């Protein structure tokens, strides 16, 4: 594995290995320049297959160009790596079988759900027992992000580094759930704006508060605070949820979110 030194080198590799019919999950083309400038992009090339690695705060993400499913790669000294495959419909068994032979194991499946405001159920969790508000203090953002990072897989769970906390505070991107008198932190929600779409990045609830409607209260607050007063009925929302998390899936479905036939499966090593 070697560092990619410039964008021309990256382009040359993509052109060489990005042949017609190849299997690829290379989603980094638009950010390749930035990754190279940060010395965060590496590559491991073989006769017919190539693998890019992006250094993250914890571990690495791998992106591949696979032209030959019989050509083995030497990943013996590579650890703490996640590879994520986007798919619609059937699970991409060819890539999964190849990657498992190279030492990866299946981690989890995430499904994308979406809705417009007009499709969503009215709030049913407004209760005096749970108070939801925007995080106004750095310490509140810090507490929320620690909960997110502790609740989700550190390789595939979108780890939030401390360097992002101030930006999250400045942009009002964190919602906090408290008990009635604000003496107990119950949970948090991280939201992202992608164009005209309001996206849930993370939702997590403290263990002692689970099963008490905290997650529903956070989602309801997220929906209401982001509705567009001029086009309220058409305000758009999206989220990703682990397919294995049946309680969360049911909560979103009951709210009115629909699966849009877009999923990812992650494998880790």
Q: For the regions a protein language model found, what residue spans apply to each?
A:
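Short amphipathic alpha-helix that is part of the acyltransferase structural core
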Residues: 1-28, 123-157
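A structural microfeature
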Residues: 49-51, 108, 184-187, 215, ...
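A conserved beta-strand-loop-helix scaffold within acyl/acetyltransferase catalytic domains
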Residues: 54-57, 160-180, 185-204
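Acyl-donor-binding surface of acyltransferase catalytic domains
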Residues: 65-130, 263-269
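Conserved GNAT acetyl-CoA-binding A-motif
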Residues: 79-91, 226-241
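Short glycine/proline-centered loop/turn elements that form peptide/ligand docking sites
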Residues: 219, 245-248, 267
